[in-house]
């Protein structure tokens, strides 16, 4: 809503509260399970491909996804820095939760997977009070971003190999 924008023209002056570096602790920052088969499928180097398949689940541990997973910690920053311009980031997939975050005093929110899954999500939220993106949190998009472009499996032009589709289905049932 435009009444919530609070002068975002100077958004570059705000601080984004982050959970760290994706390259150092990917699933802590992004949450969920890393789709090891999908990630290794796109690797060109044979020894890396098989090494990741064999040891990936120990190298990249899963961290359960919960919507707005950094909110509890971010609220501590908000309380300690009441006048600081802060942007919340971390697992926002519904208008309801975005409204909750903004109502908690954050100046803006940042989203990634929700928009990758549904590029028109922000426009849909303007129309629907209960808008929620359809991201299943299989993290296929993350698994392939290290070797080819980042993309949601729900919007690919090509058909996925059955082994990758099976992995995605299993991860999205959790």
Label the predicted regions.
Residues 19-23, 115:
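Glycine-rich beta-alpha junction loops
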Residues 27-174:
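Extended, intrinsically disordered, low-complexity segments
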Residues 2, 19-20, 91:
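Short, well-ordered beta-to-alpha junction loops that form the rim of enzyme active sites
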Residues 1-12:
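Single conserved hydrophobic/aromatic residue that forms the stacking wall/gate
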Residues 13-19, 44:
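Non-cysteine beta-strand/loop elements that form the S-adenosyl-L-methionine
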């Amino acid at each position: 809503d435009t009444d919530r924008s609070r002068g975002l023209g100077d958004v570059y002056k705000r601080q984004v509260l982050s959970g760290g570096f994706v390259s150092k602790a990917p699933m802590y920052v992004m949450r969920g399970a890393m789709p090891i088969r999908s990630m290794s499928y796109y690797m060109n180097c044979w020894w890396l491909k098989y090494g990741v398949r064999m040891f990936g689940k120990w190298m990249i541990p899963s961290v359960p996804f919960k919507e707005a997973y950094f909110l509890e910690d971010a609220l501590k920053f908000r309380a300690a820095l009441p006048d600081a311009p802060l942007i919340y980031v971390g697992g926002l997939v519904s208008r309801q939760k975005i409204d909750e975050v903004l109502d908690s005093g954050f100046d803006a929110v940042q989203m990634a997977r929700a928009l990758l899954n549904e590029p028109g999500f922000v426009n849909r939220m303007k129309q629907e009070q209960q808008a929620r993106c359809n991201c299943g949190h299989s993290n296929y998009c993350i698994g392939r971003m290290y070797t080819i472009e980042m993309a949601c499996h729900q919007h690919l032009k090509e058909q996925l190999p059955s082994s990758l589709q099976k992995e995605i289905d299993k991860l999205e049932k959790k």
